Design a protein with these regions (language model features):
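Structural alpha-helical scaffold elements that stabilize or flank donor/cofactor-binding regions
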Residues: 60-61, 132, 167
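Anion (oxyanion) recognition and catalysis
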Residues: 24, 84, 110, 134, ...
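ATP-binding N-terminal substructure of ATP-dependent carboxylate-amine bond-forming enzymes
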Residues: 1-100, 104-107
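Short beta-strand-to-turn element immediately C-terminal to the catalytic PLP-Schiff-base lysine
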Residues: 123, 152-157, 188-192, 216-218, ...
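Phosphate-binding core of ATP-grasp and ATP-grasp-like enzymes
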Residues: 167-220, 226-258, 262-270, 278, ...
Length: 363
């Protein structure tokens, strides 16, 4: 890159913080917009303290920055459209709108990107649930909002319909047939508007709908891994992607099914900071700046463990007992239960021997 840029990041959580660190290493200046003055990004960047939907604050950020990006998908797309200049938000707001609404997302994945998704139907009220086949298992998800399992109801029998009907009557939903999968996996892919680069396939283990452990490379066949990466690239190319995208998938014995996309760096890609020659945050910054993207090389098999609020002391003990482990703490002031406080990355080719911090204790 020929010159220093000022990059505006909407969102000052851990993802914004790690984006900022990558940008600063490359010589750029970072300004963050976040409602909290003591957000994680405040440790590494200037912060404009304001709500995300504050149009005046968005104007200020846009006026002071060459390029804008966001660390999460629940950003006011209309507000951004009102303040950005042409080309100032390389990720665009179309990607935001797709990822903010599961109905739009399913339509994009199945009909435009033409990748395999679980059978689904749009649900506008409980009337749409009256004729479902209860010999099958389903997941009902609100079309908008919801994360880490919020806004979802699993339907396995008629006993679940009362709660499902209430959810369906409260908001538009998507009803997905439950996938009998072997593994949950994800693929990180980054683009610069022209080209893409793809990371290794990651295997993800969730507890209470929160990511607990990521294993890289995923323990699937080479042919399935290549299929997963090809599907992620296909999605990225259909989006004309700038920046980093995570594609979450299910791996069955002989197929890959796409679950959802996140239009930003992702928790499951944090291992890349130590384990790849360029991290998902590096390629995100390169991508939104339109810079050339490198091929990604994995240094060694690795495991990433999430550190939740109830795990902080255990994680600190762990790294004193395993000094080759890499501990990242995000600088959040209050260690709330199930709040993501940090992560640990450890090189290991025996992933089952790396025990999650809360396993058998507090999941």
């Amino acid at each position: 890159m020929s010159s220093t840029k000022t990059i505006g990041i909407i969102g000052g959580g851990q993802l914004g913080q790690m984006m900022a660190i990558s940008a600063i290493y490359m010589g750029h200046k970072v300004i963050t917009l976040d409602p909290a003055a003591d957000c994680p990004s405040s440790r590494v960047s200037e912060v404009i303290v304001a709500p995300y939907d504050d149009v005046d604050a968005l104007h200020q950020l846009a006026d002071r920055c060459d390029v804008l990006t966001y660390e999460f998908e629940n950003v006011d797309a209309d507000g951004l459209d009102a303040v950005i200049k042409d080309g100032q938000l390389p990720q665009g707001t179309d990607l935001l709108r797709i990822s903010q609404n599961r109905i739009f997302e399913k339509d994009f994945l199945s009909n435009k990107a033409k990748v395999t998704v679980a059978p689904y139907k749009v649900v506008t009220s409980s009337l749409d649930l009256e004729d479902i086949d209860l010999s099958k298992k389903y997941v009902l998800k609100t079309a908008t909002g919801g994360y880490d399992g919020h806004g979802q109801k699993v339907i396995t029998s008629a006993d679940d319909l009362e709660e499902a009907n209430a959810l369906a009557n409260s908001a538009e939903c998507v009803l997905e047939e439950f996938v009998n999968f072997d593994l949950e996996i994800s693929v990180i892919v980054s683009g610069n508007g022209k080209d893409v680069t793809v990371f290794p396939v990651q295997e993800n283990i969730h507890r209470n709908n929160i990511l607990s452990k990521t294993i890289v490379p995923a323990r699937i066949s080479d042919s399935l891994a290549e299929k997963a990466k090809a599907m992620a690239v296909k999605i990225a190319e259909q989006l004309n992607l700038s920046g980093t995208l995570c594609v979450e998938m299910f791996a069955t014995a002989d197929d890959i099914i796409v679950n959802e996309i996140a239009p930003r760096p992702h928790n499951s890609g944090h291992y890349s900071i130590e384990d790849c020659d360029f991290s998902q945050f590096d390629t995100h910054i390169l991508g939104v700046l339109g810079a050339p993207l490198p091929a990604i090389h994995l240094h060694a098999p690795a495991v990433m463990l999430n550190v939740l609020g109830q795990h902080v002391e255990a994680a600190e003990r762990y790294v004193t007992e395993n000094p080759s482990a890499h501990l990242h703490m995000y600088g959040k002031l209050e260690a709330k239960h199930n709040r993501k406080m940090g992560h640990v990355t450890l090189f290991s080719d025996e992933p089952d021997s790396v025990v999650e911090f809360g396993k058998g204790i507090d999941f």
